[in-house]
Amino acid sequence: MNKLPDGWTEYKLKDIMSISSKRYNPNKDTKNYKCIELEHIESETGILNGHTNSKDIHSVKNVFEKGEVLYGKLRPYLKKFYLAKFDGVCSSEIWVLKGKKVINDFLYYFIQQDNFNYIANVSIGMIMPRADWSYMSEISFNIPPLDEQKRIASALSKIDAYLENTIKLIEEKERFKRGI
């Protein structure tokens, strides 16, 4: 068996993250929030492509806060994840994840790894497969100490920002070329 790096610890998922149970009922709550549905989250990128307003919805939604991690539990093979940049509500098919022994910025990148995706795809349902938290919560992962989580999340965040800026530049050049 391989020895863990210094400071790293093996934890079950249920010990490093939890799923929020806060709900928004449009029939009882009058506050208006941005509402994220699965179709608003781009697969494999963490990019949000729009939202609706909670005043326009009729079903109960999950509540999330800025900095929490959203993960699409329906059809987990689509790899839909988002690090919330605002408070809002989302589809009940999206888990709102909160770090317990991990910081949320690290958690956002943690759920993108192949190992996490693999266990998320051991799902319930044939036609509409969903990630199974009761199964997933018992799986163990090796987790770095807090200071290393911060370094990892910071480095990956800088790479994401660079990629996002590069994509914007390419899109601008494409628009410019079409305009000529």
Residue ranges, per PLM feature:
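A short glycine-rich beta-alpha junction/loop motif
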Residues: 6, 74, 89-95, 124-147
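A short beta-sheet element
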Residues: 58-114, 132
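Sequence-specific dsDNA recognition surfaces
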Residues: 14-25, 31-66, 84-85, 89-90
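Non-catalytic DNA-recognition/assembly elements of restriction-modification systems
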Residues: 1-25, 142, 146
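Short amphipathic coiled-coil heptad-repeat segments
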Residues: 1-8, 158, 165-180
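Alpha-helical interaction elements
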Residues: 149, 164
